A protein has these predicted regions:
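A short beta-loop-alpha structural element at the N-terminal edge
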Residues: 16-28
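Helix-loop element at the rim of GNAT/NAT acetyltransferase active sites that forms part
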Residues: 20, 31-48
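Acetyl-CoA-dependent GNAT
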Residues: 37, 49-97, 102-106, 119-120
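Active-site acidic-Proline motif in GNAT/NAT acetyltransferases
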Residues: 103-108, 112, 140-141
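Conserved acetyl-CoA pyrophosphate-binding loop and the N-cap/start of the following alpha-helix
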Residues: 109, 113-121
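Conserved GNAT acetyl-CoA-binding A-motif
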Residues: 119, 126-137
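Conserved beta-strand-loop-alpha-helix junction that forms the acyl-donor binding cleft
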Residues: 136-146
Length: 154
């Protein structure tokens, strides 16, 4: 599923661009994911587990963009990926009202309002798809994430 791009202003006045990831983002996306995993223990994998090739990541990004059950957006600042988030929808009749969300943001971009803005986008997308219940994984001790989740109504 593709995301309709938009530009937002951050707390520090910088502009951030939200868009669907491109297949050509694959190498940068792998670097981004590895850096996120290195910067915080709250990402669900270790840096050494980020072993996908650029081709595998490119195929994944193309797949998510064509998917009817998922959407990803990246936050680009000054031409570089600063964050990403994803909504994965359920396809079974019994659970179609549910979706899971995930978010990642490089440490140097924390406290600029990006996480809040990405969450607002994910919530709007989910509501538009008829989702009534959003779910996420919370890792004990992740105080920053807990604060964001509570602020967003989780």
């Amino acid at each position: 599923m593709l995301y309709q791009s938009k530009t937002i202003s951050l707390k520090n006045g910088t502009e951030a661009y939200f868009r669907s990831p491109l297949a050509s983002d694959a190498s940068e996306m792998m670097d981004f994911l590895k850096t996120c995993a290195f910067e915080t223990p709250f990402i669900l994998r270790y840096p050494e587990e980020c072993i996908e090739t650029a081709e595998q990541e490119s195929n994944y990004l193309e797949g998510i963009n064509k998917s009817e059950t998922g959407i990803m957006l990246v936050c680009v600042i000054d031409g570089k990926i600063a964050g990403n988030c994803q909504v994965m929808f359920q396809s079974r009749i019994k659970t179609k009202h549910r979706a899971s969300v995930a978010i990642g943001l490089l440490q140097r971009y924390w406290q600029l309002g990006i996480g809040t803005a990405m969450f607002r986008e994910m919530i709007a997308i989910a509501k538009n798809m008829g989702v009534l219940q959003l779910e996420l994984d919370y890792i004990e001790g992740n105080v920053r994430a807990k604060s964001l989740y509570e602020k967003m109504g989780f």
